[in-house]
Amino acid sequence: MFLKIIVPIVIKRGLMCMENGRIRIADIAEELGLSTATVSNVIHGKTKKISDETVKRVQELLEKRQYIPNMAGILLAQNDSKIIGVVINDHEKYEGHTLEDQFISASVNALAKEMEKADKFLMLKVTGKWSEIPKFASMWNMEGMVLIGFCEQDYKKLREQMHIPFVVYDGYMESSGNLVNIEVNHFDGGVQAGHYLKSRGHKDVLCISDNNICMDLERFMGLKSEIPRAELMVIPMAQEVRTIFYREHLEEIKKYSAVFAVSDYYAMDFIQFLKSVGVSVPTDMSVIGFDNVRECEKFVPPLTTIKQDYNERAAMALQMLKQLKDGECGGKNILLPVTLIERDTVNDVKLHKKCN
């Protein structure tokens, strides 16, 4: 239940008037004997035509009365609004829980920290509709925007509609004009996973993904470059359907000694399924993930995975937005490195054979 409490206080001239518990510019102006325009100009930093003494009087009373400005109005009225929009694709695979996804939450958290450092304001939107993005940007007079989770071959229409700088995470398009594409090296992540599995004697490796395009395809192709016999299994996005799918294909899955999941979420979900059918990880089957979300360390057993640096990408995104705004860059494709993090979900097949 929401309760709105209104406390009207009317006091004689020289004291404060409050409506709804909020101090107004008009109240400050009345107490000082100034115009509301003068007080407003001081609040907005437009003090060139105002005496230092008046500025000081206004600022002191604002502080004394604990005046809280309407920041939204101030920011929207400025050319440099300091508002950075972050748009997340509301993909069906998230099943209505987009912001609960570990990769998404880690990415947003890293961006929030970088924006705090840069004195920017983060405004978040979750949508699956392209048409909502330009509308969102113009409605809030944004300084720039970061798009996450979209895998489209052609951003041309969006570029034409967007008149602000924007950065795309894993955009898979030709960068030009007012945008920069920041990717992690998905192919090399697959290469590192494949090389690691091969060094431990694995030859029959299965890659699981809910699609065979964009970054997931690159991760699989990297794996296959190291292990030519590797196969791709496209799995259902919905968890309940996916569990049924695993059960129906269990005998086929058991033919492989290791599984490379294109995300930590799918890796951990798969391991939970294996546990439910009596398959032990890593004794009976090895598993590698991708992303290195926080839960990897706490998972049982701790998950071996390919790490991408969320903080590095967020810092790069803010840096590129600034450069785009200053006209210093445009049309860039930036590739960030990934690293294999060894934990406890991969068995050494060669060592196991020697012991037997």
Where are these regions (language model features)?
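N-terminal helix-turn-helix DNA-binding module of bacterial transcription factors
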Residues: 2-80
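An alpha-beta-alpha
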Residues: 191-231, 332-345
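Alpha-helical recognition/docking segments in bacterial nutrient-uptake
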Residues: 1-20, 79, 83-195, 249-255, ...
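Flexible loop/turn connectors
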Residues: 247-356
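Short beta-strand elements in bilobed, periplasmic/extracellular small-molecule ligand-binding domains
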Residues: 111-126, 204-207, 223-243
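Short acidic/polar active-site loop segments enriched in Thr and Asp
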Residues: 35, 82, 143, 202-204, ...
